[in-house]
A protein has these predicted regions:
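N-terminal low-complexity segments that are often proline-rich with Ser/Thr-Pro
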Residues: 236-240
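Hydrophobic alpha-helical scaffolding
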Residues: 16, 20, 24, 62-66, ...
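Conserved small/polar residues in nucleotide/adenosyl-binding loops
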Residues: 228-235
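Short, conserved phosphate-binding/catalytic loop or strand-edge motifs used
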Residues: 48-54
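Non-catalytic interaction/regulatory segments
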Residues: 2-9, 49, 59-154, 160, ...
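Mixed-charge, low-complexity segments
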Residues: 204-213
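N-terminal catalytic cores of NTP/NDP-binding nucleotidyl/phosphoryl-transfer enzymes
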Residues: 7-40, 45-47, 58, 137-139, ...
């Protein structure tokens, strides 16, 4: 698998780094898709993670539905088919800040200010999209073969609750479709074993957001099970 580094040289990717590079590139492609669909998007951080990737983004007042996430994934697939070359470049601080100002990347500008000792910054570009990044990345968008957007959540900028809550969009990416299919199968099996699903199906308990998420209310069958599985006061006394 070929990858490109921030200095522009291309080399084979070490096998133990393949998933990291794939997922990091997937984060960039997802950000490009988001920017195409939501031009007002202002991006924070978008790293690869142990299990996938995410990007934190300020969408203003825009709220995303499941259909919106599906459309973002669809746009990602379109970008992959466009087979855009991923190219790095480096700018001195003043030019880098100016570029981010022109692109209205306010969170990137703030992050650059935090890196006061840096005299230059590296960027990666694919088509119209530019992201501040140290890389490395896949050489073309078409090299991203298997991915899926999984969920959205909230995340504070810089993990500080005093800062603005951003939208975090998560995804997974793998070397090929077979690995993605295996992951999806594992997720389905885990859902089937989930005690919350089994308990509701067996009529053991119910939940209500008005009571509180994660707080089960036992139904008669569940209460009976609880009585049989909980130690009696006599058993507790004997164990002392």
């Amino acid at each position: 698998m070929k990858i490109i580094y921030k200095d522009g040289h291309v080399d084979e990717c070490p096998q133990d780094q393949e998933l990291h590079v794939i997922r990091h590139t997937a984060a960039h492609i997802m950000a490009q898709a988001i920017k195409r669909l939501y031009p007002q998007a202002d991006f924070a951080f978008g790293p690869a993670t142990e299990n996938g990737f995410y990007y934190d983004v300020d969408l203003g007042d825009q709220k995303l539905s499941d259909e919106d996430l599906a459309n973002i994934e669809k746009e990602m697939r379109k970008i992959c088919k466009e087979n855009l070359a991923i190219k790095p470049f480096i700018l001195p601080r003043a030019e880098a800040v100016k570029l981010m100002e022109e692109r209205k990347e306010n969170y990137k500008i703030e992050h650059m200010a935090d890196l006061a000792d840096e005299t230059e910054f590296s960027f990666f570009q694919q088509g119209e999209y530019v992201d501040m990044c140290i890389g490395p990345h896949l050489t073309y968008t078409k090299a991203l073969k298997a991915f899926k957007i999984t969920q959205q959540s909230g995340a504070y900028w810089k993990n500080d609750k005093e800062n603005k809550m951003l939208t975090r969009i998560n995804g997974v990416a793998f070397r090929n479709q077979e690995e993605l299919d295996a992951w999806e199968k594992e997720q389905q099996e885990a859902r089937e074993r989930d005690h919350r699903k089994i308990g509701k199906e067996m009529g053991l308990f119910m939940t209500d957001d008005l009571v509180g998420r994660g707080l089960p209310m036992f139904l008669p069958a569940g209460y009976t099970c609880l009585l049989y599985t909980s130690p009696s006061p006599r058993d507790t006394e004997r164990s002392r």
